[in-house]
Amino acid sequence: MTELKNDTYLRALLKQPVDYTPVWMMRQAGRYLPEYREVRKNAGDFMSVCKNAELACEVTIQPLRRFPLDAAILFSDILTIPDAMGLGLYFETGEGPKFERPITCKADVDKIAVPDPEDELGYVMNAVRTIRKELKGEVPLIGFSGSPWTLATYMIEGGSSKAFTKIKKMMFAEPQTLHLLLDKLADSVISYLNAQIAAGAQSVMVFDTWGGVLSPRDYNEFSLQYMAKIVDGLTRHNEGRQVPVTLFTKNGGMWLESIAATGCDAVGLDWTIDIENAKARVGDKVALQGNMDPSMLYAPLPRIEQEVSKILSGFGEGGTGHVFNLGHGIHPDVNPDHAGHFIESVHRLSKPYHK
């Protein structure tokens, strides 16, 4: 495999010395870029881009042509696993993802099997291999999956939800059924991420988008314990390097200590927690990723720069162990020039912290 020309992102995740704070953006390959919209229009729909290795590679690399990002992230969707389990994923305009056959009872859970990542999810592995080849060692490639809890919310609700009543009904009325599903999903995520690593992903991330809707007790029982199982089951060395693992629970700021105790290398932060506070609590154990509010990219350029400066100074001296990112995905109507200024500001303003 090609030697990495820029491994700053991987080194920061492992709390090794770096010359500046690395940066990438959640959803950096996406609708805010006109070149992405063009590919998507020609492909017909979102999953057609995901399932074509050349198109997935093209959109993964598009933001790297514009910006000096320190990592590429596989262009895919968190719902590939439930789709491969036969739930019938489809997208309604303006409605987001939906499933034709949601999970409603134990019989539904018994029917689904752990997908073979090189068979039903082979298109994802083909995309990983294609992207790695195309990157030519410029920057590392991040693989990812949804967390078992977050995948289960879509599978049981049948799509997005505001109140999560269907999954919470199962959680409180039939907890053993939900645990059975979450356990199958954890096994699926382990095999899926390990296949991505074998195909060339140099770091992996688990997105627990909906963990923050749970009480502390339920978060530990229904979300975190399954992410801990995943961390335990992952390949942590490949191609002569450590493969860092990042866990990200949106609205999970109150549980940082528990997340850090899973054995992950890094914890993702959203903007609802102060990075200085997060570092004081868990910075000795894990690296931190985040955490600018993505809506800050609507602000005038000097305001964006001011926010970057505030977050960098919040993380402070002894600057390794921080990967700069947004606290969630970049919004589709953001001006790409604002994203570019954000990235340039992180690189320029972070250098004094790494002398």
Curated annotation (Swiss-Prot):
Pfam families, sorted: URO-D (PF01208)
Class of this enzyme: lyase
Function, in words: Catalyzes the decarboxylation of four acetate groups of uroporphyrinogen-III to yield coproporphyrinogen-III.
UniProt-listed Enzyme Commission number(s): 4.1.1.37
Pathway of action: Porphyrin-containing compound metabolism; protoporphyrin-IX biosynthesis; coproporphyrinogen-III from 5-aminolevulinate: step 4/4
Claim: Lyase is one of the keywords in the record: yes
Transmembrane regions listed in the UniProt entry: none
The reaction(s) this protein catalyses: uroporphyrinogen III + 4 H(+) = coproporphyrinogen III + 4 CO2
Lineage of producing organism: Bacteria, Pseudomonadati, Pseudomonadota, Gammaproteobacteria, Alteromonadales
Gene Ontology annotations for the cellular component aspect, listed alphabetically: cytosol
Residues annotated as binding substrate: R27, Q28, A29, G30, R31, D77, Y154, T209, H328
One record GO biological process: protoporphyrinogen IX biosynthetic process from glutamate
Protein name: Uroporphyrinogen decarboxylase
Cellular location(s): Cytoplasm
Assembly and interaction partners: Homodimer.
Keywords: Cytoplasm, Decarboxylase, Lyase, Porphyrin biosynthesis
Transition state stabilizer, annotated site positions: D77
InterPro entries membership: UROD/MetE-like_sf, Uroporphyrinogen_deCO2ase_HemE, Uroporphyrinogen_deCOase
Residues forming coiled coils: none
Protein's UniProt keywords contain Lyase: yes
One Gene Ontology term of the molecular function aspect: uroporphyrinogen decarboxylase activity
Subcellular location, principal: cytoplasm
Annotated source species: Colwellia psychrerythraea (strain 34H / ATCC BAA-681) (Vibrio psychroerythus)
Family: Belongs to the uroporphyrinogen decarboxylase family.
